[in-house]
Amino acid sequence: MALVGVDFQAPLRTVCRVQFGILGPEEIKRMSVAHVEFPEVYENGKPKMGGLMDPRQGVIDRRGRCMTCAGNLTDCPGHFGHLELAKPVFHIGFLTKSLKILRCVCFYCGRLLIDKTNPRVMDILKKTSGNPKKRLALIYDLCKSKSVCEGAAEKEDGLPDDMDDPMNEGKKVPAGCGRYQPSYRRVGIDINAEWKKNVNEDTQERKIMLTAERVLEVFKQITDEDILVIGMDPQFARPEWMICTVLPVPPLAVRPAVVTFGSAKNQDDLTHKLSDIIKTNQQLQRNEANGAAAHVLTDDVRLLQYHVATLVDNCIPGLPTATQKGGRPLKSIKQRLKGKEGRIRGNLMGKRVDFSARTVITADPNLPIDTVGVPRTIAQNLTFPEIVTPFNVDKLQELVNRGDTQYPGAKYIIRENGARVDLRYHPRAADLHLQPGYRVERHMKDGDIIVFNRQPTLHKMSMMGHRVKILPWSTFRMNLSVTSPYNADFDGDEMNLHLPQSLETRAEIEEIAMVPRQLITPQANKPVMGIVQDTLCAVRMMTKRDIFIDWPFMMDLLMYLPTWDGKVPQPAILKPKPLWTGKQVFSLIIPGNVNVLRTHSTHPDSEDSGPYKWISPGDTKVLIEHGELLSGIVCSKTVGKSAGNLLHVVALELGHEIAANFYSHIQTVINAWLLREGHTIGIGDTIADQSTYLDIQNTIRKAKQDVVDVIEKAHNDDLEPTPGNTLRQTFENKVNQILNDARDRTGSSAQKSLSEFNNFKSMVVSGSKGSKINISQVIACVGQQNVEGKRIPFGFRHRTLPHFIKDDYGPESKGFVENSYLAGLTPSEFFFHAMGGREGLIDTAVKTAETGYIQRRLIKAMESVMVNYDGTVRNSLAQMVQLRYGEDGLDGMWVENQNMPTMKPNNAVFERDFRMDLTDNKFLRKNYSEDVVREIQEAQDGISLVESEWSQLEEDRRLLRKIFPRGDAKIVLPCNLQRLIWNAQKIFKVDLRKPVNLSPLHVINGVRELSKKLIIVSGNDEISKQAQYNATLLMNILLRSTLCTKKMCTSAKLNTEAFDWLLGEIETRFQQAIAQPGEMVGALAAQSLGEPATQMTLNTFHYAGVSAKNVTLGVPRLKEIINVSKQLKTPSLTVFLTGAAAKDPEKAKDVLCKLEHTTLKKVTCNTAIYYDPDPKNTVIAEDEEWVSIFYEMPDHDLTRTSPWLLRIELDRKRMVDKKLTMEMIADRIHGGFGQDVHTIYTDDNAEKLVFRLRIAGEDKGAEGQEEQVDKMEDDVFLRCIEANMLSDLTLQGIPAISKVYMNQPNTDDKKRIIITPEGGFKAVADWILETDGTALLRVLSERQIDPVRTTSNDICEIFEVLGIEAVRKSIEKEMDNVISFDGSYVNYRHLALLCDVMTAKGHLMAITRHGINRQEVGALMRCSFEETVDILMEASVHAEVDPVKGVSENIMLGQLARCGTGCFDLVLDVEKCKHGMEIPQNVVMGAGIYGGGFAGSPSREFSPAHSPWNSGVTPNYSGPWSPTGGMSPSAGFSPAGNLDGGASPFNEGGWSPASPGDPLGALSPRTPAYGGMSPGVYSPASPGFSMTSPHYSPTSPSYSPTSPAHHGQSPVSPSYSPTSPSYSPTSPSYSPTSPSYSPTSPSYSPTSPSYSPTSPSYSPTSPSYSPTSPSYSPSSPRYSPTSPTYSPTSPTYSPTSPTYSPTSPTYSPTSPSYEGYSPSSPKYSPSSPTYSPTSPSYSPTSPQYSPTSPQYSPSSPTYTPSSPTYNPTSPRAFSSPQYSPTSPTYSPTSPSYTPSSPQYSPTSPTYTPSPADQPGTSNQYSPSSPTYSPSSPTYSPASPSYSPSSPTYDPQN
């Protein structure tokens, strides 16, 4: 009997490591089933033995069977064959490795070329013990230089190079053969060997082509020891196996033939290839046998080599691709594996799945947010396997009867033996009788849990759990709010739905992935969903000031509010008629005690300060106190997706379920209001008034005129270029500015003209659709169209379109659209507009692919990073990435933005607000009540405590300002203290005007105690203490400053009670916010970074400002950072200055000049070469004067200079700009050319700055002829010098820095923040230099540069200059810049995790294949990313082992990955199991089929030996739930109970738990310690275990499933498995924690035949009991299980037996002979007289029977108020462990106990039994039965021990 829940398959073991290796020829033969030797496939229409479709290799067609394993098409996995190659060939995948190994070993003797005892080799072996790949690389580096086999040491003829090698000294023994080694080269798929010239080999050619055969011989000689040294493995991967001698032929299942109708079979590509190989192989064998010429054989071998190579890889560079006849390239094995569609990524990492549906989505605002409307057709098609149990058998039977055609029905029944019954084709489904243990695949029904998903799945909120609601028609319906996390809209989007197939999965989705649980995203700690669309628009309209609702409409709205408590609020206006405001309606929707302060979107900032800041004239301050909307218009700022808004607060304060309902209620109520109120939009809304249009036209006319002026200026050269820009750029920037200004101005005037009631405006203001710019484009003017960030470029000759004149730079021709959408665009405007739009589309398409790849890489790099149980963040190799997640160990979901009250204020304010002065009596009396003042004055340590608090606060402030030197950090911490204080004030009704009774000493001690409880890192060693201090530092600072004594008594005014509540609340919230172990934070971080990247715009924006510097931003920059690219697009330094240079622009300019690279070219005006033979009398007129002066005192020999002259004229303006002098330049020239060039130059103040250079020639004494030649060369030479000087002569600066811009920042982020003497923050605008190009090291060494703040944006450079920690911070800063540039925000912990992953190893790991795949993770993970086949080949060569720890590996192997709920094991406490309670597994119909299948075979279980009624029963064992062992309703149960009858506590053997055949024995609580029902064995005073003892009552407050007394049905016990189909969490009738109720117990199930409350005398195990036998009496002597007439299959024992029907009349509830089979105990049936509340021995008021008493020890043993005959030693007087208040018959939630049930009318005198499983039709319990009547004297609600409010019996539970 297999486990229920597993179709009958072989049990699977988990793979815990994967060993890679190469298949050796022997192994291939051993695993082969067929020797393939013929290329043919069929012979005479039959598959040919030994052919390529050998029937031993697998099944060929659907009807066939496999000859090896006799399986059919679905069962047979296929079997390998083999084919032997005539000659060995290279394996193309191992060719480069073979080459490397050849170079490491001797070509003749196969020894290693270096000595293993060499210290360097030893060192390598030691270093690379776990890394064979690295070992080969290092050994190869040592070997490749060797040209002789080692050990030629003692040859006489002084051999080259290695004699003097220190490694050879003192070595005498010859290790190798001493022969020369060839050098090897790979050509295509051949290897060539070549020897050096001096080789004295026996007349051998110097160059040969190495055959695979020869290489094989070399490899075979390598010893095992050497194999290990070269990083291979003698067992799994020997070098000789890298050469193919035997090829495995893949099974048929891998290469199925494609059968096309009507034509022949098309064979698979692999089959084609194999047939080529076989043909070539046969030809080679034939030729070899016939003794063909050598070159013929060589050609054959090469052909064979080619075919074998292209079988593996068909994309080898330098080889023709193998093709089919049609010319299509064949798909080789390598192509099958690699890429997105390949085996690994396409079939192992991601698969197509069953039980999924896909259709279009539509909106339905009336559904709750976690519900999805599913079309009936889909619901009828998707099924859920439900296990039949006695509780749901009738319900499922009903579904089975309906079959597959009607909804709701069922599709299949799966019997216990795994047989499937398809109800679609079953002739009479109604005849199929279900038995417990069967599985019914029923249709999806309302309330099922599903997973809903929309691609692209960018973050975890793209797959969420929903509940099903079956609706008509064919689309998925979903709530509008849920569209935003899915990023869905209803313009035709499709979504996928997956129906989980096990209860475990359902439980997991329900507890982790449901929509309400994902309301807040950890990405940015804010809600992911808000109110959208019409509801948002309406909520703003409804909460405006003048919205009134009359009585009927109010009633109508209240009807839409499910949480309405029945009280109509007081109307705001009473006369003339009652009217409610919209705000009041909104207040009704707000749940609970919520306090929020927000602003409306139109809130003017000026209102926040000033005398009237409490009054909001425009009603723009949204104030919600205690769940009442007091003021303000609600818009998207309050109910949108922003952090800290109403939805966020509700979710944090009141939990996810209430928040989810809040979303739904807002929508239902407000849509109902909108439906009546209406909202529309039409052309009327787009029309402004006449004056506005005039205004707009004037603005545009003026703008055009301005542009014309600028063009004029540019033409006349009056336009000054801005620094760093050319004239043209400056002009364009100016024009752009004018035109954008014009658009904005027209837009704002258009908006001003719109009235408050304009519908466009109402949508924009509420935030539901559109923005200001949309309005202005519709009404005023569309504005400038841009392409690539510039105006429309000239496309025709010097113009944009043919209708414009050439060189028209005016607004119209360059794409300014002056019309509005309303007015309509002219054709040329339309064309330009289309150009702009097209660019956007292209951009989006390109961006999607880019960011998709970035996201994939991020995920792959971080997929296995998770929080461990020790709180650290580690990857799959257990390498630490972070000590605590996010450095504070908190989950991103529970933190909020908070501000530090002590950071900003200056010293005076700080002291005023935070310093408590206990000596100031006036202050104390004003703020504290008398007794507190007295306490303060009496306390000895009061003053010192308060003083220590103040010094702590000062220290905190100092630290804060050190941590956040800018004073503006966005601090995210859990527990929003301001709001908690506000809540406390509301809950405890704090009066802010009264003095408080909260002692400051109590505050200080309370806060200190609390901060000790906030533990992130536990442990007492120094490191743990330091880590704990670091992790909680900010939280503690916040706590101490917010909850300081001064604040508490002045602003918060909490009383002692409220303060204590506050501390408790903070502690709870903090604990809740700690990150959960198992949380996959890596994937989360990758998604949180990838998702905003997708929203980023791709192209780089050039923002024109003061600094005209271009900065790469957006996706390209993100790529640069995570690729760690060496070549940045725009490398740049930001140089901060110190001292005078920072303040004084002139000094700053000095530094700039020092940095900026200046060549001669930059300062040169023009150059010329003259022939000027006489130096003194120059031919250049303007130079004459100064040259003659210069030569009056010649400083060098004029005779030797060349007649050719290079004259350079410099630009004075630039010289001054660069702070250069002529002297400096002359020095540079002299430095560069020395004595070869004569230079004379003008003075710095001369009119023109001129340099004259001549080449210093030889003496003039040479002949004229030669001179002429020289002269010719001179001028050419001069030309070269000129070119060289202009470009290469560095005058000053750093060559890498091409340009430096100088600017003074106007925003705070670049300013220097200083702390003033008063203690406030002040931003100082220093001069900043920004450079193009970087040279950080050089710049840092310059003077007047602030070395601390100067940074580079090139992370590689920072790494080289400043090291790994600096680069970590730098990456974080750069990433943050990229993300925050377009206003996104990502929580710090995600960025930090990425930075840590990139730098954890001490070097920069790029997020590319070069970084990710160079980690030491398993080969399977690496191959799932990129370079699939190469990695697998490498792994097999080095015989790597994959430990299968990561996520990818487990997914490939189909195992549960060690992450999330899979990252821990559950351990069974065997000791506890001894106290378990056994459920008889074998009472019904044939073994414990519902016991989760733990019972053995039916026959064994039913054998009489296992059910001893009276046979040899020891007193210690009492039958599981039944007072008599079996279910015998023996007379012994009559209240007069004879002690030796069947009910005697001493012989209740039942299925004794120790019975060897009973697998559940181990769990049985009835071991001797807890045995029997007799007082001797189980005395009421036993402290241990009774079902109603508080330890064991699930509803009892002290009951916890982990309680030591309880291990019965805890989730760890095998009999209780959430996946057991009978255990349905939604089952109303049972409490899963009730140990006495095991859902899987057969004996206890209302629908189980053995336990039918309506058949008193029916015991399924009684052989003599045939339901139709009239003479059968429960006390019949023939009732013995050993009776031969009893057989479970006997016809009389049939569940369908006519009289065994739940309505069987033979059952009378008061039958004394019937021991009611109450679900948790046959012994307890409320309607059975044996247990009658009025029975003296069982009286609830008896002190001994107290459901809450831990021991049943009566306080006075003989006293029982209503039981005169009560005797504490009576075996009856124990509270039966079988009776549990949570048992279904006795549980208000049980179907058989429903107050609304017709039978349960307290006045119902009669009691009609009716089918057991319909809720509310209990057969056991009639409230009016005298034995159990609330009016019965012994059961009085006032009875202390048994009152309905007693914790164990709670009607609400």
Swiss-Prot record:
Molecular-function GO terms, alphabetical: DNA binding; DNA-directed RNA polymerase activity; metal ion binding
Keywords assigned by UniProt, alphabetized: Chromosome, DNA-binding, DNA-directed RNA polymerase, Isopeptide bond, Magnesium, Metal-binding, Nucleotidyltransferase, Nucleus, Phosphoprotein, Repeat, Transcription, Transferase, Ubl conjugation, Zinc
Binding, Zn(2+) 1: C66, C69, C76, H79
Ranges for region Disordered: 1520-1568, 1589-1853
Post-translational modification: The tandem 7 residues repeats in the C-terminal domain (CTD) can be highly phosphorylated. The phosphorylation activates Pol II. Phosphorylation occurs mainly at residues 'Ser-2' and 'Ser-5' of the heptapeptide repeat and starts at the 3- to 4-cell embryonic stage. This phosphorylation also occurs in the early stages of oocyte development and is not detected in oocytes arrested at the meiotic diakinesis stage. In the somatic lineage, phosphorylation at 'Ser-2' is mediated by cdk-12 downstream of cdk-9 whereas in the germline lineage cdk-12 phosphorylates 'Ser-2' independently of cdk-9.
Subunit structure: Component of the RNA polymerase II (Pol II) complex consisting of 12 subunits. Interacts with sig-7.
Protein family per UniProt: Belongs to the RNA polymerase beta' chain family.
Protein name: DNA-directed RNA polymerase II subunit RPB1
Organism, scientific name: Caenorhabditis briggsae
